Amino acid sequence: MVSPLRLRGPRARHRDPTARPRTARLSQLKTGDPADPATDFGPLSSEKAAQTFVEQIDDAVSKGATLRTGGKRVEGPGAFVEATVLTDVTPQMRAFSEEIFGPGVVIYRVADADEAIELANSSAFGLGGVVYSKDPQRAQDVADRLDTGMVWINSPQGWAADLPFGGTKRSGAGRELGPLGIDEFVNKKLVYTPAG
């Protein structure tokens, strides 16, 4: 599963995220035991991962980003961090240039699809992306221009075991799962015999 961590939307449609019900709802999500059905977010993979995530948030806020919700460790044992929303993130911030492995999202305001694509492709990472559009052809055109290993259109949740999984750039090379994943386990050999 790939979770979208960076949302890029047109400035003309952007509303104050603090007024949106989804952002407000994030502050009410429960962290805890991932085996408990009432839990929304389990712990991060390690104490170091939780520390890195909080450092990315603190770095962004110290350099002018707006923390809309979350951003703090959850009290008690375990590598838990609150669900977090950041806006006004710039290229000088770690949250802009580093992969985020935590329950957080960075919201960018862009002029149009071209700027969103340029911003997305400027990342050193390229595991996956999601395109939302009412126009299927426009969504496909944007997906074709994204430098990522996977793109979902109008849903970040679609998945099946026979679909190839993998990224581009620093998010990896090659694919796992599906027929393309089998190629990762096959040694191919070229044998050349000159004519004559």
Language-model segments: residues:
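Conserved C-terminal structural/oligomerization subdomain of aldehyde/semialdehyde dehydrogenase
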Residues: 30-31, 73, 80-196
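NAD(P)-dependent aldehyde/semialdehyde dehydrogenase
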Residues: 8-124
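Extended low-complexity, polyampholyte segments enriched in Ser/Thr/Pro and acidic residues
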Residues: 1-2
